A protein has these predicted regions:
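Hydrophobic alpha-helical and helix-loop surface patches within well-folded domains
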Residues: 1-188
Length: 188
């Protein structure tokens, strides 16, 4: 939490932060304001590899980043799901490196997440990162490699273009300006 509070120059927005492991949870992890639930697969009962530990750190940071990207500031409509998921995916890798010491997290990101985005982008179901979501049933289709990994890859490119400090300063302004509100691409 301290890493993101310092990075975003915005205090953790909830009275407490808890994590719960949910047996037979049907997805890896999910955040709610103040609580993240994880599948029991993240509890290592025997020799976890460095890759296992990095993956868990990345997931924890991804879900923790949602406390700002997604909960403190929420998208206006599902078209802008990327404002929540792409940023959390990017912050997962960043947090794995900066807060947890997994120095190869960007290499892992390139090998796994970015390649997932490339594969998803070749399918007939590909779509823009900012998608046209006409109704709620269509929203479920966008929890995919485009919204998560392609969006995060695009953010990584943006950081390379504008610089890390400029990017983070924009995020800080975004949180201060839109805290407890809803946004779209035009607001960012």
């Amino acid at each position: 939490l301290d890493f993101f509070q310092d990075l975003f120059d915005y205090p953790y927005p909830y009275p407490k932060y808890e994590q719960a492991f949910v047996p037979e949870h049907n997805i890896g992890a999910m955040e709610k304001p103040g609580l993240v639930t994880f599948t029991e697969d993240f509890i290592f009962v025997s020799g976890a590899t460095e890759d296992d530990l990095e993956g868990r750190a990345n997931t924890i940071c991804h879900e923790m980043a949602h406390m700002w990207f997604g909960d403190l500031v929420t998208m206006k409509w599902w078209d802008d799901l990327w404002l929540k998921e792409s940023f959390a995916d990017f912050m997962g890798a960043l947090g794995a490196i900066e807060a947890n010491g997994f120095n190869d997290a960007w290499v892992t990101f390139a090998n796994r997440r970015k390649s997932w985005a490339y594969l998803q982008d070749q399918l007939p179901t590909t779509h823009p990162i900012v998608a046209d979501i006409p109704h709620l049933e269509a929203a479920a289709q966008n929890f995919d490699g485009i919204t998560y990994a392609k969006g995060a890859s695009t953010l990584k490119q943006l950081v390379s273009y504008v610089g890390f400090d400029t990017f983070i300063e924009a995020a800080r302004v975004y949180f201060k300006r839109f805290a407890w509100g809803n946004t779209s691409l035009q607001d960012f």
